[in-house]
């Protein structure tokens, strides 16, 4: 089942031709592997990109790859390093070592604050950067595509004390993929058949870190209407979840079209955009194209 289900995700490397617009110059900083960065229960690899010029207290962006991908592949095939050069933030590229090359977004451990597995390993990477690179703990964010988008939801759900916001490209809500039998795949969720009330979705996040009363992460969600791998209903379910976590309603504050085939809905909290959903009309699972990363960076405040 997992092998068949992953076939749609195996196509993710085709985004390489769509995402990158210009190669880094010869004088650009290089991606480096970091070892011994802290607790790492699932043996993730850590790759780090620090631009030649960073801000005095740089922000940190975790950029998580798709299934079958890797940290170096996501570095090469996306715009985030180039945008880091422009705006002076640091990018962490986690890399899965298990056979599927998919992030663990399903186990009870990864879905619980301090529970273990991939989410804890990634938090260790962040803490390492905060300590070694004088980065700003109040400006830590996550993004990713497909499996990486699902991990983005996991990180914001289980570690709201670490991540202030995220941008998830073609993912599913936090805990939608939850399993207890060791499986990496949840067909009901992937097929868009797991439907809950906003309260139920929000409760899943709140139970991941009981007693947490700090700031709620901001979330930007992207999904193609023709996604046949992680189907489009997951987009609406994720909006339900993150608006409920923020304590705001389901009615958009505003709706517009930044591009002809995009419909963007925004949900404000205290006059600022807390949740943003961008529906890509006729977009497939691999809808991501050049320029979308800039929208994500702008939403997260990394361009300021």
Which residues does each predicted region cover?
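A domain-start/cap signature at the N-terminus of enzymes
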Residues: 22-60, 73, 78, 82, ...
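The conserved beta1-alpha1 loop
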Residues: 59-68, 170, 223, 281
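Short beta-strand/loop motif that positions the catalytic acidic residue
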Residues: 221-223, 227
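Secretory targeting and sorting signals
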Residues: 1-28
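Short substrate-entry loop that stabilizes the transition state in hydrolases
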Residues: 54-101, 176, 286
């Amino acid at each position: 089942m997992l092998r068949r289900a992953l076939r749609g995700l195996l196509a993710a490397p085709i985004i390489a031709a769509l995402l990158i617009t210009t190669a880094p110059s010869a004088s650009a900083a290089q991606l480096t592997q970091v070892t011994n960065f802290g607790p790492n229960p699932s043996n993730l690899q850590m790759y780090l990109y620090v631009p030649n010029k960073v801000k005095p207290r740089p922000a940190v962006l975790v950029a998580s790859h798709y299934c079958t991908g890797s940290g170096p592949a996501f570095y090469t095939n996306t715009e985030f390093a180039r945008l880091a050069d422009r705006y002076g933030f640091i990018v962490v590229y986690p890399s899965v070592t298990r056979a599927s090359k998919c992030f663990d977004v399903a186990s009870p451990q990864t879905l619980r604050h301090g529970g273990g597995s991939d989410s804890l390993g990634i938090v260790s990477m962040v803490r390492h950067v905060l300590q070694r690179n004088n980065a700003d703990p109040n400006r830590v964010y996550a993004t990713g595509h497909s499996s990486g988008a699902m991990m983005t939801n996991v990180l914001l759900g289980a570690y709201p004390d670490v991540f202030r916001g995220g941008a998830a490209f073609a993912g599913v809500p936090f805990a939608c993929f939850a399993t207890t039998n060791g499986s990496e795949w949840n067909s009901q969720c992937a097929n868009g058949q797991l439907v809950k009330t906003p309260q139920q979705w929000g409760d899943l996040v709140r139970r991941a870190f009981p007693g947490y009363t700090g700031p709620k992460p901001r979330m930007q969600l992207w999904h193609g209407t023709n996604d046949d791998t992680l189907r489009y209903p997951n987009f609406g379910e994720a909006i339900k979840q993150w608006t409920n976590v923020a304590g705001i309603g389901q009615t958009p504050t505003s709706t517009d079209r930044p591009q002809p085939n995009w419909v963007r809905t925004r949900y404000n909290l205290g006059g600022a955009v807390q949740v943003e959903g961008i529906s890509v009309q006729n977009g497939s699972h691999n809808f991501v194209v050049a320029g979308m990363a800039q929208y994500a960076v702008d939403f997260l405040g990394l361009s300021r």
